Amino acid sequence: MVKQIESKSAFQEVLDSAGDKLVVVDFSATWCGPCKMIKPFFHALSEKFNNVVFIEVDVDDCKDIAAECEVKCMPTFQFFKKGQKVGEFSGANKEKLEATINELL
């Protein structure tokens, strides 16, 4: 299941409550073609990796989070463990997304 983040406090709450679990963040926008293309795959990964927390942040709705996380383009995927960023890449690369999750588990 993918959780939609609506506020900076909700974002921080997910990072804090994840504990030792990996958190994968999809920074996207409704107008972004590649974001729409990879979204079903991101949701499928959330079913496959049920020990990983998957969240989506709309950069237009949550500009403060996008700015704080230094998101420059969409989609950007960031990976957090124990509240710390442990990985990041940009672009709708399905293979890289799944490989990065496997690597960080």
From Swiss-Prot:
Cellular component terms per the entry's GO annotation: cytoplasm; extracellular region; nucleus
Compartment(s) where it occurs, according to its Swiss-Prot or TrEMBL record: Nucleus; Cytoplasm; Secreted
Main location: nucleus
Protein source organism: Oryctolagus cuniculus (Rabbit)
Pfam families: Thioredoxin
Domain of life: Eukaryota
Catalytic residues identified in the record: C32, C35
Entry-annotated residues carrying N6-succinyllysine: K8, K94
UniProt modified residues of type N6-acetyllysine: K3, K39, K94
SS bond list: C32-C35
Positions of modified residues (S-nitrosocysteine): C62, C69, C73
Feature type site, description Contributes to redox potential value: G33, P34
Self-association and partners: Homodimer; disulfide-linked. Interacts with TXNIP through the redox-active site. Interacts with MAP3K5 and CASP3. Interacts with APEX1; the interaction stimulates the FOS/JUN AP-1 DNA-binding activity in a redox-dependent manner.
Name this protein carries in UniProt: Thioredoxin
Keyword Metal-binding found: no
GO biological process: positive regulation of DNA binding; response to radiation
CDD domains according to UniProt: TRX_family (cd02947)
Protein purpose: Participates in various redox reactions through the reversible oxidation of its active center dithiol to a disulfide and catalyzes dithiol-disulfide exchange reactions. Plays a role in the reversible S-nitrosylation of cysteine residues in target proteins, and thereby contributes to the response to intracellular nitric oxide. Nitrosylates the active site Cys of CASP3 in response to nitric oxide (NO), and thereby inhibits caspase-3 activity.
Domain Thioredoxin: 2-105
Keyword set, alphabetical order: Acetylation, Activator, Cytoplasm, Disulfide bond, Electron transport, Nucleus, Redox-active center, S-nitrosylation, Secreted, Transcription, Transcription regulation, Transport
Molecular function, one GO term: protein-disulfide reductase activity
Family note: Belongs to the thioredoxin family.
Name of the gene this protein is made from: TXN
UniProt PTM comment: In the fully reduced protein, both Cys-69 and Cys-73 are nitrosylated in response to nitric oxide (NO). When two disulfide bonds are present in the protein, only Cys-73 is nitrosylated. Cys-73 can serve as donor for nitrosylation of target proteins.
Sites marked Deprotonates C-terminal active site Cys: D26
